């Protein structure tokens, strides 16, 4: 929330998608008329993540549900497209990591499972959608606002010599140069096991499974 660029690497069951959707919802409430997005390697994947996590958040915290305009035709929940419109005039939806998304305008967003997103499309299509800063309620713009151009990269472990790895190193360097804007965070499977989101016996079985790829966990 307090950083413009965040790169988060966590294992399965760490609630990374849950928390990233909550971040978007909070920003939509606090920043009127902002336009945010979620993208991933597949269109249906992003829509599925959004729908599942938003419904879960609204069930656990009903106050969030009251902030969303559930009028028919306003908030949309489909198989390959979801859009959540808030009473503040803000919204977030999913956009496709393809050439067809060129020309769209958003103020910030989440790149889910960024290890599977094409680096060229991300650099030439997705990131340029954030060229325009949010217009405040008084008609002014504040380019220095943390919301503008905000990029939250979420993924499980990936591989070296790839675009996501290069982006991770870039943000790690920025964290040293400008710590107020950039942050790189990560975690292990021990936290999900500790809070009972992940069964330790299941993790132990995976470790002993010779056919399981550890990098995919």
Pin down the residues of each PLM region.
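Phosphate/NTP-binding elements of NTP-utilizing enzymes
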Residues: 1-217
């Amino acid at each position: 929330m307090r950083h413009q660029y965040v790169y988060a690497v966590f294992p399965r069951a760490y609630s990374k998608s849950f928390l990233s959707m909550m971040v978007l919802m909070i920003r939509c409430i606090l920043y009127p008329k902002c336009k945010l997005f979620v993208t991933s390697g597949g269109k249906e994947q992003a829509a599925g993540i959004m729908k599942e996590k938003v419904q879960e958040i609204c069930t656990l915290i009903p106050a969030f549900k009251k902030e969303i305009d559930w009028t028919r035709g306003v908030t949309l929940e489909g198989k390959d497209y979801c859009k959540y419109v808030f009473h503040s005039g803000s919204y977030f939806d999913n956009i496709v990591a393809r050439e067809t998304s060129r020309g769209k305008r958003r103020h910030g967003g989440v790149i889910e499972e960024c290890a599977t997103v094409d680096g060229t499309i991300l650099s030439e299509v997705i990131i340029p959608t954030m060229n325009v800063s949010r217009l405040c309620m008084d008609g002014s713009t504040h380019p220095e606002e943390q919301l503008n151009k905000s990029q939250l990269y979420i993924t499980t472990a990936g591989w070296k010599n790839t675009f996501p790895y290069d982006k991770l190193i870039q943000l790690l360097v920025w964290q040293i140069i400008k710590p107020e804007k950039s942050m790189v965070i990560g975690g292990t499977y021990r936290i999900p096991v500790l809070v009972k989101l992940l069964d330790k016996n299941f993790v132990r079985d995976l470790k002993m499974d010779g056919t399981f790829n550890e990098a995919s966990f």
